[in-house]
Amino acid sequence: MQKKIITHSLLFFVTFLCVITSGKNVLAQDIGGADFSARPILEKHQTNNKTGYWWLDVKPGEEINLEIQINNGKQKNTFDITSNQAVTNPNFVIDYSLKKEEAHKYLSSTKLFDFYNNVFIGDSKNPGSKTIVLQADESKKIPIKIKIPASWKNNISIGGINVTRRATEEEKGQSLVNIYSSAFALILQSGRQDDSFSVSLSAGDLKTDEQSIRLQNYKDILQEKTKLQATIKDQKGTLYSSLDYSSGTIVPNAKIDLPLNVKKELQKGKEYELSIMATKEDKTLKETYLLKVDDKGKVQVTSALKPQKNKSFQLILLGLAALAIGGAGIIIYGTKKRKGKK
């Protein structure tokens, strides 16, 4: 019988714990059976000591020394510790587990801080990874060295330090193998930070029975607590597909396609409106596109619709302008009349 492997990943980012089980994201409070725990040890570069992850203020050319503590459980275990680039995945969730080639598929630029080559773990001379063995009930602090390039300034990048426990020989003999992994965010910022809210919202892959939107962040800006919504409606306002994320994080230089939840299949020869809106605090970005389905069922994006101007607001402005002109005319007329009497 083919063994089924399930990966449980703890993503310590902001205040929640995200467990990835069979590729699905589930909120949880523990990982029963993991047989270990891990925690980042914060130091002087930390911008906020109340967080459970690293957010460091660094300088170009600087070398940072961190530590992560691993507390082993009741049996001897082998751990793989890795450093990876963080990405926003198609579920609008931060993923710290991807290797370099896979992570770059979700980025609009690869000219970022290199978490695979500039981070050294333990005494390993090879960057990006380290394997250790801990005896039962053993605790150990593992050093992490980060080399900041001299040219790296006014930037921000986000990666993650992953601690994965390998399956024991006993677990390997079972039909269901659980692999447990804890991942902690590692955010590096240097110099002045851009606080603007600027992401590209466009149509992704469009078919009659499945659609997606494309989100791109071309800047070195970490967009936290971003609300994302999208709908496809016909001319009568009937909803065909939608997407609604109440909050998510967009990593710097993100490039992701997010699938919509299809309620009805698009019909041949019909027109639809795709509306995409991203909101962060009091800032909102919105794009609207006209979709046309031809007689062969091919969906085409014909144009980006410009938001209609508020006509009532325009009338108010015209009215105020007319009053201003009229008032100025009265003042000039009165002034001339008084001069004539003199």
Map each language-model feature to its residues.
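Bacterial N-terminal signal peptides
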Residues: 10-21
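Short proline/glycine- and polar residue-rich coil/turn motifs
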Residues: 58-60, 131-140, 247-256, 283
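Sec-dependent signal peptide cleavage junction
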Residues: 20-33
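Terminal connector regions
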Residues: 77-106, 141, 147-189, 268-302
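Surface-exposed binding patches on compact interaction domains or structured appendages
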Residues: 32-40, 76-141, 226-243
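C-terminal membrane-anchoring or membrane-association module
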Residues: 319-342
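Beta-sheet-dominated interaction scaffolds and their linkers
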Residues: 39-73, 77, 85, 131, ...
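Membrane-proximal extracellular "stem/stalk" segments
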Residues: 189-313
